[in-house]
């Protein structure tokens, strides 16, 4: 059980339930040939152009993604070159590839890899792609949610509760949920945009004290009478993966690929 702050006070004070996207993470290196950008650009191979073409190719794939898969791909360039007067020969990019299911984000990941290779091919350069497992989609334990929601209602009232749908961010709690029962509620104690510079916890009592009380009350209910309720939660949970399955899945997501035109 983990509680996260959020910034949607119009939806209530405590939000819970719902699902999240999973993801893989990629680091990419485009390699070209340096040359004088003004005097002899024709002797260079522009790795920044390869990255730009790759990003355009990634965007061109967006119409192929199903709405229900909620694919999110958001690359950034972390190194664009070393000097304005030199054709960029070493350009670095990072991106996450997110989706509502494992199959969805792995399929999108393959499309991203094609786009990255296409960028390198177009300019006659090369690309190295490293893919790492990120987070898996989350699923919540319904019995735990029922216990938590009753406790949360005593703190903020029934009108202060909000049942979530699907959220397109990702969380490491998703990995845990593939093997054991979890819940991941939110306290709507912040303002601003999530992960933005303006994000700030405005309601400390709600964000820290009330959130902690709701979890503590739920823990007491789960452990009461020799953890009978906790055992019921465990017994009813249908885990998608065993530990062995989980490790095998993550290891299968890890790969390094090099492509040279």
List the model feature ranges, each with a label:
Residues 52-261:
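Metal-dependent amide/peptide-bond hydrolase catalytic core
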Residues 1-88:
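Histidine/acidic-residue-rich, glycine-tolerant segments that coordinate divalent metal ions
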């Amino acid at each position: 059980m983990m509680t996260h702050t959020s910034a949607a006070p119009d939806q209530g004070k405590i939000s819970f339930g719902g699902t999240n996207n999973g993801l893989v993470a990629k680091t990419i290196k485009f390699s070209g040939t340096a040359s004088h950008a003004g005097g002899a650009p024709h002797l260079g191979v522009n790795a920044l152009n390869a990255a730009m073409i790759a990003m355009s190719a990634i965007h061109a794939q967006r119409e192929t993604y199903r709405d229900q898969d909620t694919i999110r791909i958001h690359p950034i360039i972390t190194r664009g070159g070393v000097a304005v007067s030199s054709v960029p020969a070493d350009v670095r990019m990072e991106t996450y590839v997110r989706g509502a299911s494992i199959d969805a984000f792995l399929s999108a990941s393959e499309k991203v890899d094609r786009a990255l290779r296409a960028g390198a091919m177009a300019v006659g350069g090369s690309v190295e792609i490293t893919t790492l497992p990120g987070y898996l989609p989350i699923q919540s334990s319904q019995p735990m949610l029922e216990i938590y929601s009753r406790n949360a209602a005593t703190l903020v009232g029934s009108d202060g509760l909000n049942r979530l749908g699907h959220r397109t961010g990702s969380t490491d709690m998703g990995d845990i949920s593939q093997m054991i029962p979890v819940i991941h509620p939110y306290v709507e104690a912040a303002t601003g945009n999530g992960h933005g510079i303006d994000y700030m916890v405005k309601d400390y009592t709600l964000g820290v004290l009330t959130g902690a009380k709701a979890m503590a009350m739920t823990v007491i209910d789960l452990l009461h009478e020799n953890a009978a309720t906790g055992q019921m939660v465990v017994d009813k949970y249908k885990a998608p993966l065993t530990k062995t399955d989980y490790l095998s899945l993550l290891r299968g997501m890890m790969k390094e690929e090099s492509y040279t035109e």
